[in-house]
C-alpha cells in the first residue's frame, strides 16, 4: 500500500490528519497553515486516493494496519489524531485497536456508526444515504471511464470542496466495502467510546447527522472531552476554517493528554 505523507511544522506534539471521501491530504491546508507554528502537522492520504492506484478494496484490518504503520513512522510518541468522514470511521477503529498510540482524538462530523445507530436511523435518512452511497459502491467495480465521471457528479451534488480533477472512482472503495464486503464489511457491533480525551465537531447545515444524540451526550460527559456544533456543512474545516481552527486550538490548549 502506498503511503502519502506530508509533514509541516516543528511542534512538540504531532497532529495526524486523516481525510475522507473524496479528499486527499490537501483538505487540511487551512488547518496546517494555522497550526504548524505550534504543532507538527502530518497529513496522510488514504491508500488509493492520491491517484487511482488501488486495485482492491481494503478491509478494516488492513486500513488499521496501514494507519498504525504510518503513525509509527512519523512519531514514536502518542499522537493527536484528527479525522473526518471515512477518516473518522478508520480513526475510531484504530483507537479501538491501539489506544496507547492516541493521546487525544478529534472526530469530525461522523460519530459512532455501529449497528445500533444504523438500526435507529429513520427510513427517510436511510434512503438519502442509499441514494448516493450505493451508486458510489457499485461504481467502484465499473470501468473507470464511466465510474469516475459519475463519482465527480455525485461529489458536485454533495458540494465536496475537492478539485474535480483530483476525484476518481478508486476513492469509492470504502463504500464498496461497506455495502458489499461480506464478512469484512465496515460494521461494528459495539458503540465507540474512546479512552482518551475527544473533541467532536459537526456541521448543522445538513439534512441529517451521522451520529445519535445519545452518543454525543456520552462523549461530552467524558473527562476533558467536548462536543461542538458549527453552522457549517459536512466540510466545516473548509466552510468556516477560522472558526474551526479556533475551536481546535482552544480545546488542545486546555486539554491534557490521556494518562
Functional labels for PLM-detected ranges:
Residues 232-241, 245:
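Catalytic histidine-centered segment of alpha/beta-hydrolase-like enzymes
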Residues 1-7:
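A short loop-to-beta-strand scaffold at the N-terminal edge of the catalytic core in hydrolase folds
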Residues 23, 58, 62, 239:
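Residue-level signal for the nucleotide or nucleotide-sugar donor/cofactor binding architecture
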Residues 5, 19-20, 28, 35, ...:
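Generic structural signal for small/hydrophobic residues in well-ordered secondary structure
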Residues 42, 49-75, 79-82, 86-229:
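Flexible "cap/lid" subdomain of the alpha/beta-hydrolase fold that forms the substrate-access gate
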Residues 7-51:
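Conserved HGGG/HGGXW glycine-rich cap/lid loop of the alpha/beta-hydrolase fold
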Residues 31, 94, 247-251:
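Hydrophobic residues on the short alpha-helix immediately C-terminal to a glycine-rich phosphate/catalytic loop
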Residues 9-10, 71-77, 251, 255:
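Glycine-rich phosphate-binding loop signature in dinucleotide/nucleotide-binding domains
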Amino acid at each position: 500500500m502506498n503511503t502519502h505523507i506530508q509533514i509541516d511544522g516543528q511542534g512538540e506534539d504531532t497532529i495526524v490528519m486523516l481525510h475522507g471521501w473524496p479528499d486527499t491530504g490537501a483538505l487540511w491546508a487551512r488547518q496546517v497553515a494555522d497550526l504548524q507554528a505550534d504543532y507538527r502537522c502530518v497529513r496522510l492520504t488514504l491508500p488509493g486516493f492520491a491517484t487511482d492506484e488501488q486495485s482492491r478494496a481494503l478491509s478494516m484490518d488492513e486500513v488499521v494496519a496501514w494507519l498504525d504503520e504510518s503513525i509509527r513512522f512519523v512519531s514514536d510518541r502518542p499522537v493527536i489524531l484528527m479525522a473526518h468522514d471515512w477518516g473518522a470511521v478508520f480513526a475510531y477503529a484504530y483507537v479501538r485497536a491501539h489506544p496507547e498510540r492516541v493521546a487525544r482524538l478529534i472526530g469530525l462530523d461522523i460519530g459512532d456508526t455501529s449497528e445500533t445507530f444504523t438500526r435507529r436511523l429513520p427510513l427517510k435518512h436511510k434512503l438519502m444515504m442509499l441514494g448516493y452511497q450505493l451508486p458510489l459502491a457499485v461504481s467502484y467495480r465499473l470501468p473507470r471511464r464511466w465510474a469516475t465521471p459519475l463519482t465527480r457528479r455525485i461529489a458536485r451534488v454533495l458540494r465536496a470542496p475537492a478539485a474535480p480533477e483530483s476525484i476518481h472512482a478508486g476513492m469509492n472503495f470504502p463504500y464498496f466495502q461497506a455495502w458489499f464486503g461480506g464478512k469484512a464489511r465496515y460494521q461494528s457491533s459495539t458503540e465507540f467510546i474512546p479512552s482518551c480525551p475527544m473533541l467532536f465537531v459537526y456541521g448543522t447545515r445538513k439534512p441529517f447527522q451521522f451520529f445519535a444524540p445519545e452518543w454525543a451526550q456520552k462523549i461530552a460527559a467524558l473527562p476533558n472531552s467536548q462536543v461542538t456544533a458549527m453552522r457549517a456543512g459536512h466540510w466545516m474545516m473548509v466552510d468556516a476554517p477560522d472558526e474551526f481552527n479556533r475551536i481546535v486550538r482552544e480545546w488542545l490548549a486546555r486539554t491534557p493528554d490521556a494518562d
